[in-house]
Amino acid sequence: MASNDYIIVAPNRRGLVGFGQEWLEAISKDYGGQCMRDYFSAIDDVAKEPFVDRDRLGCVGASFGGYSVYWMAGHHEGRFKAFIAHDGMFNLEQQYLETEEMFFVNWDLGGPYWDPKTAETYANSPHKFVDKWDTPIMVIHGETDYRILASQGMSAYNAAKLRGIPAELLIFPDENHWVLQPQNSVLWQRRFFNWLDRWLK
């Protein structure tokens, strides 16, 4: 990204391995909590630098980062001018019933959405904040992703279009949670940077 004239902000937020197991597990059952405040504090801090144009900030992420993009789209309060979400969770209730990895959703989300103990977790599902979406978003998803099904991406894209928000959908019929085939990788890169350039340059 730097070679395309973008400054990269990649905070070591809760849920990553940089500060031990407790830090790593801090996002479990707290998806819309402290880890999102980590993101916002990082971007707000970097945006104060004289070499940063705070009027041209974008937000991109994949997997949990894709969930984060969808969530921040409803909470960013004008910070960002464009979003890109790759293979992200949009509707956590839908995710609980669709994924092939039940251990993960039981551990990270705390169990099924019909259990009263999980109410706070599912209250942070991005689809519940679509009424606050107002920023162009690109959605990318692999159709053979069984961890986070492509229906999540399609739902997010449709929500943006129904809200009248500029949106683009890129579906790879032959990719899973990652884009592995060289020709698809080239297409991914081109569309990714075309979207950012369109809204940020």
Where are the language model's segments positioned?
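Active-site-proximal cap/loop segments of hydrolase catalytic domains
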Residues: A2-N4, A10-K201
